[in-house]
Regions:
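Active-site-adjacent pocket scaffolds in enzyme catalytic domains
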Residues: 1-12, 16-17, 62-115
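Metal-dependent polysaccharide deacetylase catalytic core of the NodB/CE4 family, i.e.
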Residues: 1-58, 92-93
Length: 115
């Protein structure tokens, strides 16, 4: 996401209550394309993994991102993922975030359940 990293009327890139579906899709597509352009203009390949701001995702966002060529998405739920040969298992993956100020050792102990 380029500009959907704040709480306010919208939580991350979730569709607002009562928001027109077409308007929402346009907003998410344009925001995502802005990021893609910035990255490719820097000579880097376009990302194929989308990381949801605040982990806030929906069926609408998953459908749109798949149509844009994304091969996986990451939420914020801290969990271990099971990856299979089914490409759909790569969507709404969990992840572990290491907060600023936490040592790598402490972080890994927590992530591995040794805390």
């Amino acid at each position: 996401s380029w500009n959907l990293h704040e709480y306010g009327e919208r939580r991350g890139c979730l569709r607002r209550r009562g928001e027109d579906e077409t308007r929402y899709e346009t907003l998410l597509r344009e925001d995502t394309e802005q990021t893609q352009t910035l990255i490719t203009d820097a000579g880097l390949p376009a990302p194929t993994c989308y990381t949801y701001p605040f982990g806030a995702c929906s069926k609408e966002s998953e459908t749109l991102l798949k149509s844009m060529g994304f091969r996986c998405t990451l939420g914020c739920e801290e969990r271990i993922n099971t990856v299979t040969r089914n490409p759909d298992c790569l969507f709404e993956l969990g992840r572990f975030n290491r907060p600023a100020g936490q040592s790598t050792e402490s972080y890994l102990h927590r992530a591995l359940g040794e805390d």
